[in-house]
């Protein structure tokens, strides 16, 4: 279901899957833990990749060598460029309290999906982000 919501967000923005890059913020199964077992991120990434979407991951709690080969691992967010959507997958402090202004400048369009409902979406919207969240209708921020 979440994969289809993300595809809908991208489609409504006029993006085709083949040219789209998504950045996962977090990968582990719960916040502040470096354990990738049973993570919902892996099947979500696979579902997006099956649609032709490229997936990058930033998770400072997990050893970069343990990620699947199919994802692009980013260890420094200043290197995260050209993404069309950031997805907060895990509510690590490092993923919630990051430099959102800096990340916005590196993205094709500052667009975020809060999969944990922990971000201050109002502040992000004031800073120019298009914000979406689990449980929030897509039409709230066109």
Tell where the protein language model's regions lie, with residue ranges:
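Structural/interface elements that position substrates and couple domains in central-metabolism enzymes
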Residues: 1-142
């Amino acid at each position: 279901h979440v994969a289809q919501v993300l595809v809908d967000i991208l489609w409504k923005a006029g993006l085709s899957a083949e040219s789209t890059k998504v950045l996962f913020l977090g990968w582990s199964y719960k916040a502040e833990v470096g354990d990738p077992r049973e993570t919902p991120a892996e099947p979500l990434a696979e579902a997006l990749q099956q649609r032709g979407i490229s997936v990058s991951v930033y998770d400072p709690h997990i050893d970069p060598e343990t990620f699947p080969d199919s994802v692009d691992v980013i260890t420094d967010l200043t290197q995260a460029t050209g993404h069309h959507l950031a997805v907060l997958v895990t509510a690590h402090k490092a993923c919630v309290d990051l430099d959102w202004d800096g990340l916005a400048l590196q993205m094709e369009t500052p667009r975020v999906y809060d999969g944990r409902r922990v971000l201050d979406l109002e502040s992000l919207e004031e800073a120019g982000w298009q914000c979406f969240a689990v449980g929030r209708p897509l039409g709230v921020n066109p």
